[in-house]
Amino acid sequence: MNTIKTRFGVIDYDPANLLLFPNGLVGLPHLRNFIVMPNKKEGPLFWIQSVDDPDMAFVLTDPNNFFPDYQIQPGKDEHTTLGISGSDEYFILSVVTVPADQKITLNLAAPIIFTPTNNRAVQVILGGDGYSTKTPLPTVKRHERRSVVNE
């Protein structure tokens, strides 16, 4: 077991269980090794904590929780980087931003493709798909509550 001091406190982790980004993250190629933080609350969000830079952590989610039609297929380069074949399981994740105004956004323009087969991930930049790095969460309309009176 190794130990790292982070914003979450001191964390013990097994290097064999690290999430590996062989190419790092977009704009942060030096960040390659992450701990997936246990989710303390129910919900679709979770943290990944960088082992390479203890000051860096990111919130991730499955974008299909909010955008059911969002579909990304890994290309040949991603298959090679992830070390997977066409039949291996993979998941699409998005980086979540929670600004001071609490208007949460998802980065749909640069999704993360994750494979549990070997605990590897790659962040890709989509071109020409019309996705944004700051896609607001869809608004949920509140239904009026109506009371029914039995006579």
Curated annotation (Swiss-Prot):
Location in the cell: Cytoplasm
Q: Does the keyword Chaperone apply?
A: yes
Can the keyword Chaperone be found in this entry's annotation?
yes
Cellular component GO terms, alphabetically? cytoplasm
List S-S links within the chain: none
List the Gene3D superfamilies hit by this protein, alphabetically: BH3618-like
Q: What does this protein do?
A: Acts as an anti-CsrA protein, binds CsrA and prevents it from repressing translation of its target genes, one of which is flagellin. Binds to flagellin and participates in the assembly of the flagellum.
**Which Pfam families does the UniProt entry name for this protein?**
FliW
- Subunit: Interacts with translational regulator CsrA and flagellin(s).
Protein name per its UniProtKB record: Flagellar assembly factor FliW 2
Task: Please name the source species.
Answer: Desulfotalea psychrophila (strain LSv54 / DSM 12343)
Chief location bin: cytoplasm
**Per UniProt, which keywords does this protein have?**
Bacterial flagellum biogenesis, Chaperone, Cytoplasm, Translation regulation
Lineage of origin: Bacteria, Pseudomonadati, Thermodesulfobacteriota, Desulfobulbia, Desulfobulbales
Family, per entry: Belongs to the FliW family.
